[in-house]
Structure formats: C-alpha cells, structure tokens
Amino acid sequence: MAAGKRDYYEVLGISKNASSQDIKRAFRKLAMQYHPDRHKAENETTQKQNEEKFKEVNEAYEVLSDEEKRKLYDQFGHEGLNASGFHEAGFNPFDIFNSVFGEGFSFGMDGDSPFDFIFNRSKKRQQQIVVPYNLDIALVIEINFFEMTNGCNKTIKYERKVSCHSCNGFGAEGGESGLDLCKDCNGNGFVIKNQRSIFGTIQSQVLCSTCNGQGKQIKVKCKTCRSNKYTVTNQIKEINIPAGMYSGEALVDESGGNEFKGHYGKLIIQVNVLASKIFKRSDNNVIANVLVDPMVAIVGGVIELPTLEGIKEFNIRPGTKSGEQIVIPNGGIKFSKSFKRKAGDLIIIISYARPCEYTNLELKKLREFIKPNQEVKQYLNTLKNEYKT
C-alpha cells in the first residue's frame, strides 16, 4: 500500500463486497459530515483535519465508484493506481462532491441554525438576480425503527427567509427608488485594482467592497428589515415519511425553502433512522433475535415474538434448536403502493436463554428423561479418532 494512504474501503466504512449503492450511500453520509463549509471547526488544526478527511473520502469514492479503477485497486492496491497515473494526476474533491449532490451545492452557513447548511442556486439564476442569502434549506430529523418500517407523519418547525414586503427586497426605504448609484464603482459593481509585480503593473478587476458588486447604495435603510432585504418567518409543516427510507436519505419540497423576489428554494429534509435494540434491517427484511427457555424449546410450547405490530404468541415445535430461524412472510418493511416494491419478511432467530434453576428433586426427575444424544455421540467418535491419529 502507498505510504500514508488508508485503505479506501476503510475510509468509507464499507466491506470489499459492497454494492455500488452501498458505496454511494456511505460517500453521501461522510461527504456531508466532513464538508469544510458545513461545520466551521473551533480551531485551524481541526478545520484542516476535516478538509483532509473530505479529500480522502472523495478520493476513495472516485476510485470505488468507477468499475475499472475499483478492479485495478482490488487487485494491486494503491501501487496499481500509482502505476496508472491516478494519484499523480490529482483531482478536485469538490468536482466529485458536485457530481453526486448536484452542481451549485454548497453549505454557506449564515449562522442562523446548525441545520441551515444550504444550497446555492444555479449560476443561471444568480446572473438574473443577486440573492443575498442561500435559497435552499436543509434540515435533519430523526425517526425510530418502527416509524421507518411503517412510515409516519412528522411536524417540523423551521425559520424561512422571505423578501421584505416593505422594501420589496431592496433594503431601502421606498424600495428600488431608495437606491443611488455606488460612487466608488459608478454602478459597475467592480473596480480596477493596480498591483505591482516583477512583470510590471498588473491591473485586475475586483468586486466593489462598498456595494458588494450590486452597483447601488442604500440612501435610507428600510425600517422593517434594517437593510437586510428579508424578514424571517416561522414555518410549521407536516411531512409524510414513507416506509422503508434508509438513514441519510432525504425528502425534497421543491418550493419549501427560502424566498427572494419570487424565487423559491428547496426544503431538503434528511431523515436519520435511530437504531433499534431488538430489530435490524436487511434490505426489505427485518431480523430479530429471540431468547427462549431451553426446556420450552425441547418440549415445544408457546413463546412470545416481537413483531412490527407488537408482541405476539407463537407455538414452536418440540426440539427447536438454538440458531433456528422462523420466517414470517410479509412481516418486514411494507412499502406504499407508489414504491411498487414487495414487502419484506420478518426473520426470527432463536437463541437459548440461561437455564432456570431447579431443585434437587426436580433435577432428579429430569435426569430420568435423559437419553443418549446421537449428535453428541457422533462428535465424541470424531474426537476419539482425532486422538488416534
């Protein structure tokens, strides 16, 4: 392995037989976690560490998401990639990030909320109108395992920015008529800066710091928004979370984000599923381990099983073994009709609990029923033959 480089599967936290969907899902989660613009670190050292991790995650995804590069890496490791020129060629981690999340995605936090890591609009829209804040809003909500398997409704509360109704988003008393041309840039939005270098004087065009590139200045600040150009409204919205969502997946309301002068952003709601102490998910199936008294397993009888609808009684046959599986068809995740996916199964795995304590009299009676176990007898014969050799 190339010096200093971690295993790409380890970087993404996946196994070597992970599917392309597993790879993409792991990348989306880690890229969101370490994006330099999402969480500004408390110190420069931590910030640099996050940037390095972000670069590492993107590099791992670029290789493992490409069938040919992944095959080369699986066979020869980092050395194989070096020989092919991958590491020397270099790459832009943000290009990879944008290819997955979409062009124009950024987190541009403006300090309102830890969840307001939001997306910029496209370049085309930015050319038409200067938006003083990010239009798209991203929120994170948590649901439990049962809410994931059955689907649920959630009420969310969030703050939404809208253009000020008093100044129509211009930030000045009287709206657009309350603006003057910027005196520093004469309304151009930029100024020419001269800088000396070894090659002589170099002229460069830079954004006007006085008007922030807008070419106009406010004469009198709007009293309603104090020249911010927007006001904040409190929103309450009920959303439907369909059954079967994976943790980290998102719901999108195309016009539920911020608004500015008739332009609406998206509301992106990332859904995180809390782990269950009883159940585990395996694709569409749900798996649960059930403790059973060994005596009940031997003689058969009624046990209580956990299901997604609650605890139910189930009759097990005599001689039920530890590790044996009970499959309840359609007892797993049930998708809505729009998904057109078959419901999964509930898979119960039997595990023996610690035996009960019995009195000497009870133990004496139990010994009367003990008879040679053929499986144990076969094991002992194998053991004896092992010693003979």
Curated annotation (Swiss-Prot):
Chain positions recorded as Zn(2+) 1 binding sites: C164, C167, C222, C225
PROSITE patterns: DNAJ_1 (PS00636), DNAJ_2 (PS50076), ZF_CR (PS51188)
GO cellular component terms listed in the entry, alphabetical order: cytoplasm
Record key words, sorted: Chaperone, Cytoplasm, DNA replication, Metal-binding, Repeat, Stress response, Zinc, Zinc-finger
Highest taxon in the source lineage: Bacteria
Primary localization class, coarse: cytoplasm
Domain J: 5-79
CDD domains tied to this protein: DnaJ, DnaJ_C, DnaJ_zf
Zinc finger (CR-type): 151-234
GO molecular function, one term: zinc ion binding
Ranges occupied by CXXCXGXG motif repeats: 164-171, 182-189, 208-215, 222-229
Cofactor, how bound (note): Binds 2 Zn(2+) ions per monomer.
Pfam families tied to this protein: DnaJ, DnaJ_C, DnaJ_CXXCXGXG
UniProt record, GO biological process: chaperone cofactor-dependent protein refolding; DNA replication; protein refolding; response to heat
Cross-referenced Gene3D superfamilies: DnaJ domain (1.10.287.110), Heat shock protein DnaJ, cysteine-rich domain (2.10.230.10), Urease metallochaperone UreE, N-terminal domain (2.60.260.20)
Binding site for Zn(2+) 2: C182, C185, C208, C211
Entries under InterPro entries matching the protein: DnaJ, DnaJ_C, DnaJ_domain, DnaJ_domain_CS, HSP40/DnaJ_pept-bd, HSP_DnaJ_Cys-rich_dom, HSP_DnaJ_Cys-rich_dom_sf, J_dom_sf
Names of required cofactors: Zn(2+)
NCBIfam families tied to this protein: DnaJ_bact
Record remark on domains: The J domain is necessary and sufficient to stimulate DnaK ATPase activity. Zinc center 1 plays an important role in the autonomous, DnaK-independent chaperone activity of DnaJ. Zinc center 2 is essential for interaction with DnaK and for DnaJ activity.
HAMAP family tied to this protein: DnaJ
Subunit structure: Homodimer.
Family according to the record: Belongs to the DnaJ family.
Stated role: Participates actively in the response to hyperosmotic and heat shock by preventing the aggregation of stress-denatured proteins and by disaggregating proteins, also in an autonomous, DnaK-independent fashion. Unfolded proteins bind initially to DnaJ; upon interaction with the DnaJ-bound protein, DnaK hydrolyzes its bound ATP, resulting in the formation of a stable complex. GrpE releases ADP from DnaK; ATP binding to DnaK triggers the release of the substrate protein, thus completing the reaction cycle.
PANTHER family referenced in this protein's UniProt entry, alphabetically: CHAPERONE PROTEIN DNAJ, DNAJ HOMOLOG 1, MITOCHONDRIAL-RELATED
Protein name (database record): Chaperone protein DnaJ
Source organism (scientific name): Mycoplasma genitalium (strain ATCC 33530 / DSM 19775 / NCTC 10195 / G37)
